[in-house]
């Protein structure tokens, strides 16, 4: 995947809004009173109850282990003309990895990450991801990464911090002890040989004794000959907001179109620590639309729900997504757009496939930041993408 258009759009954000906005520091990640932790976790789980989640100490779900065969190979795939598939293709191979282990005292809360290389010698097609979360897990996020150096020892990290630059693409977010995300039949993400992945684990020890944090992740692949369409991502949002200190705020409704050929099979929203909601609707601009996100699932910024669609959402000419983001700025400084933990974001990403395959797409609503750019800027579609590429190639000048 060519990440340059994505990075170009991030540069555009930086040029428009800068990256030096101030805000209050992130709250401490360690709670001094374990009893407070237990109360908070129970409240969250009782309120959320997303897809039957009971926390990492709940009863294990029954999941069949897919067969582990040899590498699926790198045969050429025709993703231009997907056909209806009557049966789900068999799993060709499974690639396992994990994050862990580290010890946690009662009441301790922390987020750690690893960067690891999978052992696929050839290009493979991933159609499902299974996670198995250990005791005390709050949630785990799995990314496809463009990094080249492994960091196999867990290190402290902050959720989603590196998604905007294009180096990490979220593939799965889960808070359930055992869960499998399956793409539609014959739809798969392409993994390059020895694909790098990033695993982010948020752990919370609400037990009276020490625990050992650990989570397993498995990627299930299908043969290249069974791939009918390549899965990819739509990354949509706006940097047009300035959240007043000590106040609630929302962006108002924005609209971004979607290719007519796209079939969206899952969607999730994204903010930073002050975010209270990302609302998304499906339909034509300036007409009545259907609410599709988050529906009856509560939105938590660090464990945003993933809504799946079966059948997938379809789009006619002029249709797309209408969305708005909301925040509660409990700090004492205004907060604007940025990638740091002390700034905010308003984004959502959608998993899709199409005929022909159109690849990764990122769209923004510039809003009042720079009205001359129009209602939306999309890369790689917009002429501005090539201008920014020229800017980069020129070392910061045209």
Feature locations, PLM:
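Sec-dependent bacterial lipoprotein signal peptides
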Residues: 1-17
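Ser/Thr-rich, Pro/Gly/Ala-heavy low-complexity intrinsically disordered linkers and tails
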Residues: 19-87
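Beta-strand-centric surfaces of beta-sandwich/beta-rich domains
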Residues: 82-398
